[in-house]
UniProtKB/Swiss-Prot annotation:
Disulfide bonds: none
Gene3D superfamilies reported in the protein's UniProt record: Periplasmic binding protein-like II
CDD domains per the UniProt record, alphabetical: PBP2_lipoprotein_IlpA_like
Chief location bin: membrane
Record InterPro entries: Lipoprotein_NlpA
UniProt keyword annotation of Signal present: yes
Record keywords, A-Z: Cell inner membrane, Cell membrane, Lipoprotein, Membrane, Palmitate, Signal
GO CC annotations on file: plasma membrane
One GO-annotated biological process of the protein: D-methionine transmembrane transport
Protein name (database record): Lipoprotein 28
Lipidated sites in chain (N-palmitoyl cysteine): C24
Length: 272
């Protein structure tokens, strides 16, 4: 999924929260029940497998609460309507905690939905020529992520101390004199057919529409040690609860890994 850096908490969002959570009690106090927020679609399909594993292995009843986007799950978890959620990576959580004063913590890794470099012109990093044009996302989180991936491949060097949000201005060494083109994430799959673009760095969210597989069709790709691995998130006050631990163990199971491999066409790399 694509997680943007800035989110608006509007009156409409609060109304939507009320609709989504209407009729729902506070998060469960039953050790054999857990309420987990997920994003509708493929990610919920993966969570459904974890739900089945939790019931079979631990007798844990998992109630999945679906959301249409990343605006509300942290708010609902922080205020106790959910026990946990599973949809985001650590940089997103850290930003949301800082922006809204949430007391949320990561309790374990789930999947890396990897960003990768794709091309219809080359097959390996060694084939990237002097002066090649590399298209990357232009939103701050994913732009920084793409630059860090280029650095991992030793194509550029970034200024130290920039953390997870470097910009093109922080490139200190560019031995192949790559031309960095910043575009909206949704446009990146289309530029694979642009004769002026040699490589495009694209998130799993947008590459899925092309039928390409991050694992099988990319020139280079993030690995499971990526700081952008997705996480199971709970509150400070319930992070050690037995139901949270059992759901994490269920999610980090071979059954879930196998299902995610199929559901995401190789675009979900186990991060545990």
């Amino acid at each position: 999924m694509k997680l943007t850096t800035h989110h608006l908490r509007t009156g409409a969002a609060l109304l939507l929260a009320g609709i989504l959570l209407a009729g729902c009690d506070q998060s469960s106090s039953d050790a054999k029940h857990i309420k987990v927020g997920v994003i509708n679609g493929a990610e919920q399909d993966v969570a459904e497998v974890a739900k089945k594993v939790a019931k079979e292995k631990y007798g844990l009843d998992v109630e999945l609460v679906g959301f249409s986007g990343s605006l509300l799950p942290n708010d609902a978890t922080n205020h106790g309507e959910l026990d946990a959620n599973v949809f985001q990576h650590r940089p997103f959580l850290e930003q949301d905690n800082q922006a809204h004063g949430y007391k949320l913590v990561a309790v374990g890794n789930t999947f890396v939905f990897p960003m990768a470099g794709y091309s219809k012109k080359i097959k390996t990093v060694a084939q990237i020529k002097e002066g090649a044009t590399v298209a990357i996302p232009n939103d701050p989180t994913n732009l920084g992520r793409a630059l860090l991936l280029l650095q991992k491949e030793k194509l550029i060097t970034l200024k130290e101390g920039k953390g997870l949000l470097p910009t093109a201005l922080d490139i200190t060494d560019n031995p192949r004199h790559l031309q960095i083109m910043e575009l909206e994430g949704a446009q990146l799959p289309r530029v694979l057919d642009d004769p002026k673009v040699d490589v495009a760095i694209i998130s799993t969210t947008y590459i899925q529409q092309t039928g390409l597989s991050p694992v099988h069709d990319s020139v280079f790709i993030e690995d499971k040690n990526s700081p952008y691995v997705n996480i199971l998130v709970a509150r400070e006050d319930n992070k050690n609860a037995e139901n949270v631990k059992e759901f994490l163990q269920s999610y980090q199971s071979p059954e879930v890994a196998k299902a995610a491999e199929t559901i995401f066409n190789g675009g979900a790399v186990p991060g545990w």
